[in-house]
Amino acid sequence: MDISISWVVIILLVLSYLILMEKWRAAKLPKNLPPGPPKLPVIGHLHLLGGGLPQHVLRGITQKYGPVAHVQLGEVSSVVLSSTEAARQAMKVLDPAFADRFVNIGSRIMWYDSEDIIFSRYNDHWRQIRKICVSELLSPKNVKSFGYIRQDEMARLIRLFESSEGAAINVSEEISKTVCTIVSRVAFGSVVKDQSLLLNLVKESLRMASGFELADLFPSSWLLNLLCFNKYRLWGMRRRLDNFLDGFLEEHRVKKSGEYGGEDIIDVLYRMQKDSQMKVPITNNGIKGFIYDVFSAGTDTSAATILWALSELMRNPEKMAKAQAEVREILKGKTNVDMAEVHELKYLRSVVKEALRLHPPFPIIPRLCIQESEVTGYTIPANTRILINVWSIGRDPLYWNEPDTFNPDRYDEVPRDIIGNDFELIPFGSGRRICPGLHFGLANIEVPLAQLLYHFDWKLPQGMTAADIDMTEKPGLSGPRKNPLILVPTIHNPTS
């Protein structure tokens, strides 16, 4: 009995301490903080996140409390931005104050202590690696030079689909493999031997790293940090990733040049590593972190967008017919298809825009406010986590007519770009932290999609209708389809 009473006293003392800390933190917050839902003691609004995907839940909050809303997730103060104007102020007007990135357990472990570019803090390391990326690695000129790789791999995929004509195929699996091979050849100069292992590592780590860990939301609690079992699983995956990358990088170092000749991304990074003029030394972990960025952001997101575009076209046969008519008219008789040819495909590019609007590769863009700022009249304290709900902005009825409807024709009336200038459509972000692989990613989406629409007519498996296509999203950083897309290809005969 005495032991039971002692435990009750301890629990009450701990709860009292947490409630007092909560009141102390609340007293320090500015009076003009954005509005938000009523919160519970200790956990704040954490209980609200159990009702669906984060982008959906946060949209529900901002629809009720306004496009700029405050959410308290445990000890962590966060502000959700779900309007074009709020995003414009944070990513353009006040860009330096919102250019930092907060780091959680998953990103710290899998992305090499933020020595990569995606999760790097806003510092000299980030400025240097971004400059290298934009000028040396993924510039439009370099992306264009990778065209022969895209052509090779699409020719292989087309042969595979031709050999399976009339049969139901897991299109999701084959497109993921193809995009992974393209990225592999660009990054490593050759095809990765254990490509399926790397692809599975990327997908699983993205899934695990995208979740909320209690230890992240209660950073002062050593106990929650100790009991964060997902952290130990992530470290296990990190060791597997290290073994894989260390072995491949050593092979690459010995081989000196890629399988296909020329200088690949690793060659450039090794060259920069030896450059004594570098302000911040490039470490081996930095190289591995960047390579992991290329695979995690370049493979999963590009494949997911192609699959969402195909899914939407299959649900809208008239849009599919229009896209195929354009592709087959403009590409007729052309043996090599890459960025120059795709640039002529106005409607196909609108299809991609619309797929990115409805299914952005990163539904929520995380930022960190590093100095007290004012957004749409509300005060955002320093060290507040910012969650820019790109998914919600792309479905805002103030800017989009019938926002939940797939309609590529809408861009004929109001052209919008996707390179960060039009804040109604920011699938790759904007400002200093805009995705540096934007051009590489678009090439790996538009070129394969054009080829698939040119060479094949697509049908659903027997017994399925357009209404049966499952459009459910899966949790993850890239917002992929929950279930694979199964389609039946029929070879298109231009002479028939």
UniProtKB/Swiss-Prot annotation:
Its EC number is 1.14.14.-, 1.14.14.51. Induction: Induced by jasmonic acid (MeJA), salicylic acid (SA) and UV-C irradiation. Accumulates upon root colonization by Myrmica ants (Myrmica sabuleti and Myrmica scabrinodis) concomitantly with jasmonates induction; this leads to the production of carvacrol, an attractant for the phytophagous-predaceous butterfly Maculinea arion, whose larvae initially feed on Origanum vulgare flowerheads before switching to parasitize Myrmica ant colonies for their main period of growth. Slightly repressed by Spodoptera littoralis, a herbivory insect. The chain crosses the membrane at residues 1-21. The monoterpenic phenol thymol is widely used as a fragrance and a flavoring ingredient in food and cosmetic industries. Its derivatives have also several biological and pharmacological properties such as antimicrobial, antioxidant, anticarcinogenesis, anti-inflammatory and antispasmodic activities. Medical applications include the treatment of disorders affecting the respiratory, nervous, and cardiovascular systems. It may also act as a growth enhancer and immunomodulator. The monoterpenic phenol carvacrol is commonly used as a fragrance and a food flavoring ingredient and preservative. Its derivatives exhibit also various biological and pharmacological properties including antioxidant, antibacterial, antifungal, insecticid, nematicid, anticancer, anti-inflammatory, hepatoprotective, spasmolytic, and vasorelaxant. Phytochemical inhibitor targeting the main SARS-CoV-2 viral protease (Mpro) and ACE2 in human host cells, carvacrol is a possible candidate for treating COVID-19. One of its GO terms (molecular function) is iron ion binding. InterPro entries: CYP450_71D, Cyt_P450, Cyt_P450_CS, Cyt_P450_E_grp-I, Cyt_P450_sf. Heme binds at C435. It holds the Pfam family p450. It is a single-pass type II membrane protein. Gene3D superfamilies: Cytochrome P450 (1.10.630.10). Pathway: Secondary metabolite biosynthesis; terpenoid biosynthesis. One of its GO terms (cellular component) is membrane. It is found in: Membrane. Optimum pH is 6.8-7. Keywords: Heme, Iron, Membrane, Metal-binding, Monooxygenase, Oxidoreductase, Signal-anchor, Transmembrane, Transmembrane helix. Its cofactor is heme. One of its GO terms (biological process) is response to salicylic acid. It catalyses: (4S)-limonene + reduced [NADPH--hemoprotein reductase] + O2 = (1S,5R)-carveol + oxidized [NADPH--hemoprotein reductase] + H2O + H(+); gamma-terpinene + 2 reduced [NADPH--hemoprotein reductase] + 2 O2 = carvacrol + 2 oxidized [NADPH--hemoprotein reductase] + 3 H2O + 2 H(+); gamma-terpinene + 2 reduced [NADPH--hemoprotein reductase] + 2 O2 = thymol + 2 oxidized [NADPH--hemoprotein reductase] + 3 H2O + 2 H(+); (4R)-limonene + reduced [NADPH--hemoprotein reductase] + O2 = (1R,6S)-isopiperitenol + oxidized [NADPH--hemoprotein reductase] + H2O + H(+). Expressed in flowers, leaves and stems, especially in glandular trichomes. Involved in the biosynthesis of phenolic monoterpenes natural products thymol and carvacrol which have a broad range of biological activities acting as antimicrobial compounds, insecticides, antioxidants and pharmaceutical agents. Catalyzes the C2- and C3-hydroxylation of gamma-terpinene to produce carvacrol and thymol, respectively. Also mediates the C6-hydroxylation of (4S)-limonene to form carveol and the C3-hydroxylation of (4R)-limonene to generate (+)-trans-isopiperitenol. Belongs to the cytochrome P450 family. This is Cytochrome P450 71D178. It comes from Origanum vulgare. The lineage of its organism: Eukaryota, Viridiplantae, Streptophyta, Embryophyta, Tracheophyta. The gene is CYP71D178.
